[in-house]
Amino acid sequence: SLVGSEMCIRDSRFGVRQKEVLRKIRAEVDVLTLTATPIPRTLSMSLEGIRDFSVIATAPERRLAVKTFVTSEQDGTIREAVLRELKRGGQVYYLHNEVNTIENTRARLETLVPEARIAVAHGQMRERELEHVMRDFYQQRFNVLLCSTIIETGIDVPSANTIIIERADKFGLAQLHQLRGRVGRSHHQAYAYLLTPPDGAFTKDAQKRLDAIQALEDLG
């Protein structure tokens, strides 16, 4: 059969060469690109009228904006954020993006929040093991998922409505936007905590990114 259309989800994950390879499969193929964070080339072509584009600005019914906090990393803040979610029967993503120290962070969280049932997920795990952990988290056998950025895409857990991101100053604006989008996928109020070093040792550019993601929390 002939290819008549192509759908590209998450434009930012595909480079120009990759897209051209897909288009060469069939010259007259129709291309539909879906993205919340378009790459500059795609955005520019749309704004200049080279490509048609539509904006979906209406949030799903009963969806609430994620409340976003930028704060220095403190044990008290972490415990309060986790417990608030657990007390309403919800789940938490705790993002620690250094696999070699993730078990140390697990031990710290177990001491800090002994009430939590913690699972670990990262990209260096065997595929079957990772699938098992994610399935158990979805089924609420665990209420805190200590993870890497592996959760950035393809994860939809409506009962997970708090995300805590360590060293948020190290992430780009688009990535922070994607990570924050893992929560707030139901009618419950969701929270995102972007943690920075307690000593304030991060760049001015990082501060600008954090200020921007905190300011741009409205839906649509």
What are these regions (language model features)?
Residues 1, 5-6, 10-211:
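Inter-lobe coupling/hinge segments of SF2-like helicase ATPases
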Residues 215-220:
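C-terminal or mid-to-C-terminal helical accessory/interaction module adjacent to the motor/catalytic core
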